[in-house]
Amino acid sequence: MAEQTERKLLLSRWGQLRTERESWMSHWKEISDYLLPRAGRFFVQDRNRGEKRHNNILDNTGTRALRVLAAGMMAGMTSPARPWFRLTTSIPELDESAAVKAWLANVTRLMLMIFAKSNTYRALHSMYEELGAFGTASSIVLPDFDAVVYHHSLTAGEYAIAADNQGRVNTLYREFQITVAQMVREFGKDKCSTTVQSLFDRGALEQWVTVIHAIEPRADRDPSKRDDRNMAWKSVYFEPGADETRTLRESGYRSFRALCPRWALVGGDIYGNSPAMEALGDVRQLQHEQLRKAQAIDYKSNPPLQLPVSAKNQDISTVPGGLSYVDAAAPNGGIRTAFEVNLDLSHLLADIVDVRERIKASFYADLFLMLANGTNPQMTATEVAERHEEKLLMLGPVLERMHNEILDPLIELTFQRMVEANILPPPPQEMQGVDLNVEFVSMLAQAQRAIATNSVDRFVGNLGAVAGIKPEVLDKFDADRWADTYADMLGIDPELIVPGNQVALIRKQRADQQQAAQQAALLNQGADTAAKLGSVDTSKQNALTDVTRAFSGYT
């Protein structure tokens, strides 16, 4: 009875979540039609379908701009080619420890290797594209023996979410289809419904079966127990059409294992809005104008014809070089255009260009491609960097939300999995009980922080100018602190920065070497003087013998 009640509750909540999501579906469907026809699952059977879906797209400017947005966010936030985050303790004194720095750097490198080996980067790119189009994205992060973690990327319409009172997503239901072979391999034949077992026995392995996966907080659990039935989140797979006493699998997670970012939220909304929603009107206008332009070109290149009545039911050739015989002497004889076709398309073409630019701006394509589209080849590197940073500041709010709803949870989930898999290097003794923080050092994150480096650069430059007049002003400048602060602003690998205690030791060794060299030089000078004095002949009359005799009492 408990399982039956649990299953009914899950089906009931799935229905409630679908009802809550329903108002978004038509909007997502329209965005899919005009921007990403292959994305979106608005019916559970919408999988692995190869029919033509791009019929509404006459001008693909919107699709290409969305592709630039996804690629720009991928390269700017989570580029596989460079480190985009680092771990810190948020305790400055502890961060200065060489052992702590080395351990944090090793863990960061290990985590980046896990991301590269798994499908993390492919999932992130898919999520960025979904965010730009539908405003909400989702990926379930599950443990994997070979790659440590594995992502199940979802698309709009395939899932429904709910949030807690702080607006954080804590519930995800998804409805999807898998083949009979996949279901039996994943859950076991005994767990499947009698219908699936019968299909498997008949060899219908490629028959599609609907499955619902529910992830939500577990209300009835015993925190003192550590088994999967008492973890903070429960995970249940079941067939909606099977008998009410059967579930495919019930387990649990210590934390919410789904990434559910939203591009931007308004008020208490659960699902986010997106650049595609803002640009949808322009995208539809562009398709309409391209259709009218094509019709106008058809009128000019293939105008309607007016023929005499005598030509009715006669063979008329309208192909280039064709011959037609008509009675030209009759009134209105001959073949001529039905009306004068002299359409001016310049205004339409100008508006098409304007609409295209608006669409690109909505997707920040001008931002990500501003270097490629630059018109001034004489710009200095400093001018290019300043323009780059100024434009990237427009992504500040989005970047903060992506850090909070994608990257922070992703790193935390991966770190937890590394602990469970026992692949972390042993931490230094001084780190016991210390919480770790994530600091993002991607190109976009650094662009947000680069304003601080500009002020530091101006200060150092002006200080150097003043030092040319009054050198003692350099006594106010702490070069060691400048090196550490500037390296932190730029996200430099801590292994490239020598710790302060090692710097003090190096300077002491250098001072000792300089002092020893000075002493050696003095000794060499004294020995050279003694050698010169020792070579003087004191038996003859000279200044040295005169001085020696004077001190000896001789005249």
From Swiss-Prot:
GO terms for cellular component: virion component. InterPro entries: Connector_podovirus. It holds the Pfam family Head-tail_con. Keywords: Late protein, Viral capsid assembly, Viral genome ejection through host cell envelope, Viral genome packaging, Viral penetration into host cytoplasm, Viral release from host cell, Viral short tail ejection system, Virion, Virus entry into host cell. One of its GO terms (biological process) is symbiont genome ejection through host cell envelope, short tail mechanism. Its main location: virion. It is found in: Virion. Belongs to the podoviridae head-to-tail connector protein family. Forms the portal vertex of the capsid. This portal plays critical roles in head assembly, genome packaging, neck/tail attachment, and genome ejection. The portal protein multimerizes as a single ring-shaped homododecamer arranged around a central channel. Homododecamer. This is Probable portal protein.
